[in-house]
């Protein structure tokens, strides 16, 4: 939503009267339905952001990684921001049972977190908001 309006919408209840743009058939559309939001289905998440930028819709529901990369300072949509999470996103990597790759990947994640590489990459690609500390 427009960064200038962000403080007016601290939670889902405060957004009840907004018109949202959401990707048709997406988890975003599911969240719009679940929350009883008014929404316009669009072809993809990039179009949802464009709808907000053009003023056709007041807000969009998109993936948090997409939001972090597409809106805010240093992007084409510097006057937009993201605010609340309507659900959680979790990603996983799977390997064949008995493979030693899971342990190797876990070691890589721990080492790249410890030496700052993971943070540097997250900063570089605009996904810091989705970074999960490795312990």
Residue ranges and their predicted role:
Residues 10, 20-35:
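Secondary-structure junction motif
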Residues 13-16, 33-35, 46-61, 65-66, ...:
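Short helices/loops that flank or line small-molecule/ion binding pockets
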Residues 2-3, 23-26, 44-45, 61-71, ...:
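Beta->alpha turn/N-cap motifs
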Residues 1-19:
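Flexible hinge/capping segments at coil-to-helix
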Residues 7-8, 24-27, 40-54, 89:
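Short helix-initiation/N-cap motifs at beta->coil->alpha
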Residues 52, 60, 93, 105, ...:
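Residue-level signal for nonpolar/aromatic packing positions in well-ordered secondary structure
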Residues 28-31, 64, 68-125, 128-135:
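Periplasmic-binding protein-like
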């Amino acid at each position: 939503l427009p960064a200038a309006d962000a403080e007016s919408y601290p939670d889902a209840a405060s957004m009840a009267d907004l018109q949202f743009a959401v990707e048709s058939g997406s988890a975003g559309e599911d969240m719009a339905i679940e929350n009883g939001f008014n929404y316009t289905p669009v072809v993809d998440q990039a179009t949802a952001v464009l709808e907000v930028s053009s003023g056709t819709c007041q807000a969009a529901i998109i993936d948090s990684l997409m939001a972090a990369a597409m809106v805010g300072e240093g992007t084409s949509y510097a006057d937009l921001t993201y605010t609340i999470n309507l659900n959680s996103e979790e990603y996983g990597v799977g390997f064949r049972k008995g493979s030693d790759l899971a342990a190797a990947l876990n070691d890589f994640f721990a080492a790249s977190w410890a030496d700052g590489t993971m943070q540097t990459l997250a900063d570089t690609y605009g996904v810091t908001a989705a970074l999960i500390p490795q312990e």
